[in-house]
Curated annotation (Swiss-Prot):
Top-level taxon of the source organism: Bacteria
UniProt keyword annotation of Metal-binding present: yes
Name the UniProt record assigns to this protein: 1-deoxy-D-xylulose-5-phosphate synthase
Gene Ontology molecular function: any one: thiamine pyrophosphate binding
Subunit-level organization: Homodimer.
Length: 614
């Protein structure tokens, strides 16, 4: 820590608050450098945290955390917060097995008020926390930090609408890094922020409300005048004022002096407050400033050269999907690709560039994405919703009410299904088979490799009903891609014929299943379809084998193995059944290989489980 003389002294925000304001720019400089060095050595989210260094320092300097409660939305930007709150020396373990969590996590630190991972939850939770504090007369302050992407979600506006109606004391900070700081985010805005948050103005504002409450015409005139003063700098503020917030900003989110001055003033204000700050994602590191998307989440890399390592030569499943989408769009103008703000992650960059009229990024709005797709289907188009398994959970009612009940031809391309890895509990794709399987009209497919994935996407697209194809995070296995053809619905493939034991595989654990079967002389069936399931095959296997083993990367409860159990029960088979899958707890972070080994779903673990069962 010799390169970080001030930062090495900071083991908690209390230490930070002992520094003079004149020392804070140096702390920001050291914090940014330390963040870059640690993430480049461990992997993780980089660009967002680089952009929130000054804000993080200012918040912990002004607010008495953890007594005052600071809530980070999503948590990508919370790495500086972790460094300042006693976890500096553990940053090298972030996102690793048994290491510190990639997002704020309640079990990890008293400074992490809310466990997060999905976006747009901070204001709702913050309002609940603020109401609880107000009822207890605790005297603590509540601050929510939310990004310009997360605030587009309906949940954020629902919470602000409620907060405005309750007039609860809380502060929402919008970290706006969508554009670089323009000239109007300078002296005039900073001066106006000081004016509008100052005690003189706020006392006149609140006192004037009481005096003028019985004089509506004058009250309305004063309100309009105030709005025009604020709107002179930021017309967007009027929208938040209409929700019942006192809007301040935008101000420079990298000016530590102005941030502290504004926050000190706002801490004393009553009612819901909204501070709009402008930051630059990747601030202070030229490669990340130039490519904030590429440096959003990074593997280990050389931060001196700024070069990210090249990926595996085998394409990812996301790229397989993106290539399939382009191939289909070349011949079908009715295809519409939809993503809820995950263009890069879902492999849709090329599609969005080549077919912009057939591409929609609906922002962080999963519910809207699904019902928007339903509307397109009603209008005669063929929508494909590309969505991570963990985010599809957020649109469950829309899948049922707006797609399945009407039996509309919407294809769900479910990325990151199964064990995802380093992002931990909030991002594992553990539940989609279970929550989709119980929905009438839904077809569910589980490809075992990239060619199967393409064929299943094609099959689902050609069906005149809802369909889902789930595929994992990571690289495919390198099989040959064959021309697209429709698959027979609900039909499985015999991969290996053995005796006594039959492994019924659902998904990309097939190579592992084959290796286990070689040792046990077991039959292997690639089931392919969870729904409709191959009842005939299950019946035949049950008659000729002593033990059926189901294998899936989904929770055991309600999963594909449960579907097999239901078939066996309905046909009154007495064949033994061993269901292997994800257990009944939230799966923590680690590499995919580490997690599968811990869950006994690697080759050795599966073999041991079968032998123990016998």
């Amino acid at each position: 820590m010799q390169n970080y003389p001030l930062l090495s002294l900071i083991n908690s925000p209390e230490d930070l608050r002992l520094l003079s304001k004149e020392q804070l720019p140096q702390i920001c400089q050291e914090l940014r450098a330390y963040l870059l060095e640690s993430v480049s050595q461990s992997s993780g989210h980089l660009a967002s945290g680089l952009g929130t260094v000054e804000l993080t320092v200012a918040l912990h300097y002004v607010y008495k955390t953890p007594f005052d409660q600071l809530i980070w939305d999503v948590g990508h930007q919370a790495y500086p917060h972790k460094i300042l709150t006693g976890r500096r020396d553990q940053m090298s373990t972030i996102r690793q097995k048994n290491g510190i969590h990639p997002f704020p996590w309640r079990e990890e630190s008293e400074f992490d008020v809310l466990s997060v991972g999905h976006s747009s939850t901070s204001i709702s939770a913050g309002l609940g926390i603020a109401v609880a504090a107000q009822r207890e007369n605790a005297g603590r302050k509540t601050v929510c930090v939310i990004g310009d992407g997360a605030i587009t979600a309906g949940m954020a506006f629902e919470a602000m609408n409620h907060a405005g109606a309750l007039h609860t004391d809380m502060l929402v900070i919008l970290n706006d890094n969508e554009m670089s700081i323009s000239e109007n985010v300078g002296a005039l805005n900073n001066h106006l922020a000081r004016l509008l948050t100052g005690s003189f103005y706020s006392s006149i504002r609140e006192g004037g409300k009481k005096i003028l409450s019985g004089m509506p015409p004058i009250k309305e005139f004063v309100k309009k005048t105030e709005e025009h003063v604020k709107g002179f700098v930021s017309p967007v503020g009027t929208m938040f004022e209409q929700l019942g917030f006192n809007y301040i900003g935008p101000i420079d989110g990298h000016n530590i002096e102005e941030l502290i001055s504004t926050l000190k003033n706002m801490r004393a204000l009553k009612g819901p407050q909204f501070l709009h700050i402008m930051t630059k994602k990747g601030k202070g590191y030229a490669p990340a400033e130039k490519d904030p998307i590429g440096f959003h989440g990074v593997p280990k890399f050389d931060h001196l050269s700024g070069q990210l390592p090249k990926s595996n030569t085998t394409p990812t499943y996301s790229k397989i999907f993106g290539d399939w989408l382009c191939e289909m769009a070349e011949n079908d103008p009715k295809l519409i690709g939809i993503t809820p703000a995950m263009r890069e992650g879902s492999g849709m960059v090329e599609f969005s560039n080549r077919f912009p009229q057939q591409y929609f990024d609906v922002a962080i709005a999963e519910q809207h994405a699904v019902t928007f797709a339903a509307g397109l289907a009603i209008g005669g188009y063929k929508p494909v919703v590309a969505i991570y398994s963990t985010f599809l959970q957020r649109a469950y009612d829309q899948v049922i009410h707006d797609v399945a009940i009407q039996n509309l031809p919407v294809l769900f391309a479910i990325d990151r299904a199964g064990v995802v890895g380093a992002d931990g509990q909030t991002h594992q794709g553990a539940f989609d088979i279970s929550f989709l399987r119980c929905i009438p009209n839904m077809v569910i497919m589980t490809p075992s490799d990239e060619n199967e994935c393409r064929q299943m996407l094609y099959t689902g697209y050609k069906l005149n009903q809802p369909a889902a194809v789930r595929y994992p995070r990571g690289n495919a296995i390198g099989v040959e891609l064959t021309p697209l053809t429709m698959l027979a619905l609900g039909k499985s493939n015999l991969i290996r014929e053995g005796e006594k034991i039959a492994i019924l595989n659902f998904g990309t654990l097939l190579p592992t299943a084959i290796n286990v079967a070689e040792k046990l002389n077991a039959t292997v069936i690639d089931m392919r379809f969870v729904k409709p399931i191959d009842v005939e095959r299950i019946h035949q296997i049950a008659q000729t084998h002593d033990l059926i083993v189901t294998l899936e990367e989904n929770v055991i409860q309600g999963g594909a193995g449960s579907a097999v159990a239901e078939v066996l029960h309905s046909q009154q088979h007495q064949t033994k059944l061993l269901q292997l899958g994800l257990p009944d707890f939230f799966i923590p972070q680690g590499t995919q290989q580490e997690i599968l080994a811990d869950l006994h779903l690697d080759e050795a673990g599966i073999e041991t489980q079968i032998k123990n069962f016998l």
